[in-house]
Amino acid sequence: MSQTTATLPLPSPESAIALAGSGEDNLTYLAHHTGAKLILRGQELMVVGTEKAVARVMAVLQSLAPYWQSAKAISRPDLMTAFHALDTGKQEEHQALQKTVLAKTRRGEIVRAKTFRQRQYIKAIQKHDVTFCIGPAGTGKTFLAAVLAVQALLNNECDRLILTRPAVEAGEKLGFLPGDLQQKVDPFLRPLYDALYEFIEPEKIPDLMERGKIEVAPLAYMRGRTLTNAFVIVDEAQNTTPAQLKMVLTRLGFGSKMIVTGDITQTDLPNYQKSGLQVAQTILKDVEGVAFCYLNQADVVRHPLVQRIVEAYERSENTSPPAPKPSS
């Protein structure tokens, strides 16, 4: 079969590094999925292969041009999404995805939806007062909600930001734990703090909390309140009981938005206890003003090394013989 060659000039050494990835992982991935050979020499990428293979590589790289042209690292999910767009004829939508900027982190990093489903999730939050997002860890459920919440707070679109999750590991019996309230709930709410730190200087957060602009508390502390002009994020909702989730949903006041996130495959509730998130899917699926979004493994955004570690463990689990049963 005849071979063809195409070259892609890169604007800077940093662009070449961003495109190639750590250890040229991105080039290896492109080669594996197209059959083409990719050779990076300085600020020029050479692609060799069949006409179809070369065309696929060039189309994917052109769709990701906003990344490597600005020397922003390209991740495995970025490549997966670009291939999916190419194979499904959604290249224009994918290019629009790259141009949509949600926010910038404190370090100046651009935050945008990585996948089509993430973009649908963002649109749902913007359009609805209550949005459920269900999917596995690492899909950006809480992070994207926090991005929109912080932007709303900084742009004075809401009066306060409320982050809550069930402290199921402590059975919500926080009175049995040593320390004051803040010391008791911090370990359970740390993932929410991590999202805040991406956008707000850590030293400013205590002042915002003191002024009531940011509240981070376990779910039990929402009882009996009406949350008006607030942006509320309910995290780890798979660990709520139906009664708990109903309680927090009915706290919603005028001018507020609520995002409920969780992974229904990873509940810490006792086996006999139904998850409030699962029940809500059935009860609220047709309620006007409520949206349900579903993310899956294709939306997982991981550090490339973490991805390789996960894949290595999966290969080991698939090939290892079952452990022997203990003798009776």
UniProtKB/Swiss-Prot annotation:
Keyword rRNA processing belongs to the record: no
Alphabetized Gene3D superfamilies for the sequence: P-loop containing nucleotide triphosphate hydrolases (3.40.50.300)
Keywords: ATP-binding, Cytoplasm, Nucleotide-binding
Chief place where the protein resides: cytoplasm
Record: residues binding ATP: 135-142
GO molecular function, a single term: ATP binding
Cellular component GO terms, alphabetical: cytosol
Subcellular compartments: Cytoplasm
Family annotation (PANTHER family): PHOH-LIKE PROTEIN, PROTEIN PHOH
Family of this protein: Belongs to the PhoH family.
Full protein name: PhoH-like protein
Protein source organism: Synechocystis sp. (strain ATCC 27184 / PCC 6803 / Kazusa)
